[in-house]
Amino acid sequence: MVLLAGALLLTLLPSCNKRPWSEQQRSYARDMLREWRNVVYLNELSEEEFALFSGRVADILEMRYPSYVEFAEMPMVGDSIEMVIVAAITSELKATPERLRHILSYDDLVELGTLPAGLTRHRQNGFYRCLAERINQTYGSIQSFVWDAMYSRLDSSLTTQMLHRCAAPFWDSELDITIIEE
């Protein structure tokens, strides 16, 4: 993906090394971010929210790298793009119940068997409150948590334990008692 990103960036090089990015280059940068659409958090955004997000990332890239040519020719350009994406995600997120829904959606947690189906919004909020508290206590920064989430290290990490501990109270164990009268 890094090589693809670099090759695609080089196709839109302007003739002047120091000109600001053209609208075509900015548009291309936003379109290139579509490759990241399936990443945790970004896959939960609506098309409008994603358009705003990719516009902000393109703005950050242009601000950090005013010369599109220098940016496109930079070694490891894909890593730079990735760092800006992570920084943009973490600047939007703090470990709060409302924002954790974008990283770990309720439907996904039900599908994984972490939470039971049919929880009320109030009970879902209780789960996300618990998880936000544990994340804030465990990880030094939300960025560390986002890195784990992006690179699918949640399965074998401390985060999985936190998920299960916070989910445990929501698994109601009901007993079916049948009274047989003789």
Short names for language-model regions:
Residues 17-182:
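Mature extracellular/luminal domains of secreted and GPI-anchored eukaryotic proteins, especially small
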Residues 1-3:
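Bacterial N-terminal signal peptides that target proteins for export
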Residues 8:
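Active-site acidic/histidine clusters and adjacent loop/turn architecture
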